[in-house]
Curated annotation (Swiss-Prot):
EC class (word): translocase
Origin organism lineage: Bacteria, Bacillati, Bacillota, Bacilli, Bacillales
Subcellular location: Cell membrane
GO-annotated cellular components: plasma membrane
The name this protein goes by in its record: Copper-exporting P-type ATPase
Function: Involved in copper export.
EC numbers, comma separated: 7.2.2.8
UniProt-annotated binding residues for Mg(2+): D689, D693
Positions that bind Cu(+) 1: C15, C18
Active-site residue list: D494 (4-aspartylphosphate intermediate)
Annotated positions binding Cu(+) 2: C82, C85
Pfam families referenced in this protein's UniProt entry, alphabetically: E1-E2_ATPase (PF00122), HMA (PF00403), Hydrolase (PF00702)
Length: 794
């Protein structure tokens, strides 16, 4: 057995006990010698390679509560022609030492690879791809990639034009066989046909030979193999016929030069149309990229300097004039203006900005000159994060693609086998001893089969669907979430900031100003949304705030503070009961009254004596009732989940049309409530702000983070709703359902085309050129069907 040495970067070690624990765990494995260095945070492992895989050691380390460093790289891949290619590359990468997971997308021509940096690197991964016959490079900027694809499209167009010019005369020869029209006799000359077809076969069509050779050399087969074998059979049979004619001069040869040339031309036409259609699938991403400013006006040494955007650094001072885009995320340091943030929030009304306010890159400055300090630049800006989410979603795979991937892996060998069987049956049984009909039928089988349509069926729909959703402010994190969302039958909505605006105001206060001063001073240390409303209310009354000696937040109950040796309690009935503070019937009636109105009522106790009541209300979003109505019309059960008291929650629920309410739930219990719904067989989506309900978002089958501007937690959820518009929640479900429906249509067409087309070709009912045209158009039709999603109404 061969010995192998492996080094892993470990995350989470804090002391020698950690490193010793990991070392002991690894050394308990048979035939393993491990040393863990706390200083370098690395584990060096010697083991017998036949006994273990890298993942075995990672699993052992993770079982102790530590992790192994993983990096991610995106590669552009050139040379893929069909699903067999992408599947081959993906399989090889996933079998590579050090790779955690790799996915290859035929539509975007990219690979997304997660790997252990101490076990492999980008250069090794690129070399691995090159060794199986494809070209790979580290992903360039989206703009550079767009320019490269434009050049590739132009190159494909030029090849198509040349091939068409050479093949057109041969097409006329083919027409003579099926119609009585006359053509110049020179075109029937075998030598002319040879001269016209040879450049098409071996210069224009050389790419098919190269692709076939590379795949066969590595023990696999793809579309190039089918095209190369099929067209070569027609071409070289024609050469054979010419040689027999020159030798015997007995009859005019039966030539198929036109078949090989026209097949190649039609396939090139299909590939060109496919590339053009695929370029349209990234329009949404292109539009996002176009939102970015190209340069910024930076103030240095009291001078204005125009710099490219990539030269701007955090801390730079920028001047933005009216009508200009905000170049980067920043904070206003001087001036007042209004900003159009509709590109991010969907809200058409400009937002007023003054000194100290945050601004978002790529939004539009409307009517005032301002100076800002850059806080986020380059890939860290809000728009860059959005673009990254869209790119990742468009490059990802949906689980529904697995069947197509499995079939594509065996597709070409099966088709070649069917072609051979077809040839044998025809030459032995159908037309015994006749070579031509057998050859023509076999060629038709080879060229009608299309693994491309199978490979494009899912990713093109995912690209267009997620792009269209992004245009509407809905960001899917990946194809798997597009698929998972269409199964959702229950949506759980957090109340504050989701159903309501999240900007509460004080509606009633019963008590004196001294109590209000103590109340506001205590709440000033709290981060709860209601606290801001109380502090603002007290300041508007002209009260000065006092310093807290101590402060404690009691989730689900309220707060406790000490101010000038006085104990202050602010909260609900539970809090008062915990401190044995009695609540009179009159006080309880007042609480019930406020709660019946949908307000949150809190009592203020000073030294265990209730001195006042304050009621705070949060207004319901204008679109909440309509959004919930749309969800219910889609047969989706809507649940409100809140920490607020049941009476207030029921009042808000009644306003918006929610029947199922789960109230008085502590933040840490929200995830448990999601589990209870899932235990009933529900497919649950949780909608919240992604911050204080993150565990519930993670626990749900689909987590949706909803928020405004740069504050929305994109990383916290599977789907991000920009702008805080609750109507985007049903739209997200609609986008998911429409995309999955489109994928199923594509898969049905791709499978059905091959299942029906191959037997028809084998029966000799299709001429090779018709079979080739059908093959070329099959993949185009799949892409065109996916493009229909660009017009879907959400």
């Amino acid at each position: 057995m061969a010995n192998t040495t492996l080094t892993l970067d470990i995350i989470g070690m804090t002391c020698a006990a950690c490193s010793n624990r990991i070392e002991k765990k690894l050394n308990r494995m048979n035939h393993v010698q491990a040393k863990v260095n706390l200083t370098t945070e690395k584990a060096t492992i010697d083991y017998e390679s036949d006994d273990y895989h890298l993942e075995d050691f990672v699993e052992q380390i993770q079982s102790l509560g530590y992790d192994v460093a993983v990096e991610q790289v995106e590669l552009n891949i050139n040379g893929m022609t069909c699903a067999a290619c992408s599947n081959r590359i993906e399989k090889v990468l996933n079998q590579t030492q050090g790779v955690q997971q790799a996915t290859v997308n035929l539509t975007t021509e990219q690979a997304l690879i997660k790997y252990y940096p101490s076990a492999t690197n980008t250069e090794a991964l690129i070399k691995r791809i090159q060794n199986i016959g494809y070209d790979a490079e580290t992903k360039t900027s989206s703009k550079a990639q767009s320019n490269r694809k434009k050049q590739e499209l132009k190159h494909k167009r030029n090849k198509l034009i040349i091939s068409a010019i050479l093949s057109l005369p041969l097409l006329l020869v083919m027409v003579v066989h099926i119609s009585p029209i006359s053509i110049p006799s020179i075109l029937v000359n075998p030598w002319v046909q040879l001269i016209l077809s040879t450049p098409v076969q071996f210069i224009i069509g050389w790419q098919f030979y190269v692709g076939a050779y590379k795949n066969l050399r590595n023990g696999s087969a793809n579309m190039d193999v089918l095209v190369a074998v099929g067209t070569s059979a027609a071409y070289f049979y024609s050469i054979y016929e010419m040689m027999m004619w020159l030798t015997h001069q007995t009859h005019h040869p039966h030539l198929y030069f036109e078949t090989s040339a026209i097949l190649i031309t039609l396939i090139l036409l299909g590939k060109y149309l496919e590339a053009r259609a695929k370029s349209q699938t990234t329009n949404a991403l292109s539009e996002l990229l176009n939102l970015q400013a190209k340069e910024a006006r930076v103030i240095k040494e009291n001078k204005e300097i125009m710099l490219p955007l990539d030269k701007v650094k955090v801390g730079d001072t920028l001047l933005i004039k009216p009508g200009e885009k905000i170049p980067v995320d920043g904070k206003v340091t001087k001036g007042d203006t209004s900003i159009d943030e509709s590109m991010l929030t969907g809200e058409s009304i400009p937002v007023e900005k003054s000194s100290g306010d945050s601004v978002i890159g790529s939004t539009m400055n409307k009517n005032g000159s301002i100076m800002i300090e850059a806080t986020q630049v380059g890939g860290d800006t809000a728009l860059s994060h959005i673009i990254k989410v869209v790119e990742d979603a468009q490059s990802s795979k949906a689980p529904i693609q697995r069947l197509a991937d499995i079939i594509s892996g065996y597709f070409v060998p099966i088709v070649v086998s069917i072609a051979v069987i077809t040839f044998i049956i025809w030459i032995i049984f159908v037309h015994p001893g006749q070579f031509e009909p057998a050859l023509v039928s076999a060629i038709s089988v080879l060229v009608i089969a299309c693994p491309c349509a199978l490979g494009l069926a899912t990713p093109t729909s995912i690209m267009v669907g997620t792009g269209r959703a992004a245009e509407n402010g809905i960001l899917f994190k990946g194809g798997q979430f597009v698929e998972r969302a269409h199964y959702v039958d229950t949506i759980v909505l957090d109340k504050t900031g989701t159903i309501t605006n999240g900007q509460p105001v004080v509606t009633d206060y019963v008590g004196d100003n001294d109590t209000l001063q103590l109340l506001a001073s205590a709440e000033n240390a709290s981060e709860h949304p209601l606290a801001d409303a109380i502090v603002t209310y007290a300041k508007d009354k002209g009260l000065n705030l006092l310093d807290n000696d101590t402060f404690k937040s009691i989730p689900g109950h309220g707060i406790k503070a000490t101010i000038h040796q006085q104990q202050i309690l602010v909260g609900n009935r539970k809090l008062m009961n915990d401190y044995n503070i009695s609540i009179s019937n009159k006080l309880n009636d007042q609480l019930n009254h406020y709660e019946h109105l949908g307000q949150t009522a809190m009592m203020i106790a000073v030294d265990n004596q209730i001195n006042g009541i304050i009621a705070v209300a949060d207004t319901v979003k204008n679109d909440a009732k309509q959004a919930i109505k749309e969800l219910r019309n889609m047969n989706i059960d809507v649940v409100m989940l809140t920490g607020d008291n049941n009476r207030t929650a029921q009042t808000i629920a009644k306003q918006v049309g929610i029947e199922h309410v789960i109230a008085e739930v502590l933040p840490e219990e929200k995830a448990h409530q999601i589990s209870l719904l899932q235990d009933k067989g529900k497919q649950v989506a949780m909608v919240g702000d992604g911050i204080n309900d993150a565990p519930a978002l993670v626990k749900a089958d689909i987590g949706m983070a909803i928020g405004t501007g740069a504050e929305v937690a994109i990383e916290a959820a599977d789907i991000t709703i920009l702008g805080g518009d609750l109507l985007l929640v049903p739209k997200a479900i609609k986008a998911s359902k429409a995309t999955i429906k489109n994928i199923r249509q594509n898969l049905f067409w791709a499978f059905g085309y091959n299942v029906a087309g191959i037997p028809i070709a084998a029966c000799g009912l299709l001429a090779p050129w018709i079979a080739g045209a059908a093959m070329a158009l099959s993949s185009v039709s799949v892409v065109m069907n996916a493009l229909r999603l660009k017009k879907m109404k959400l």
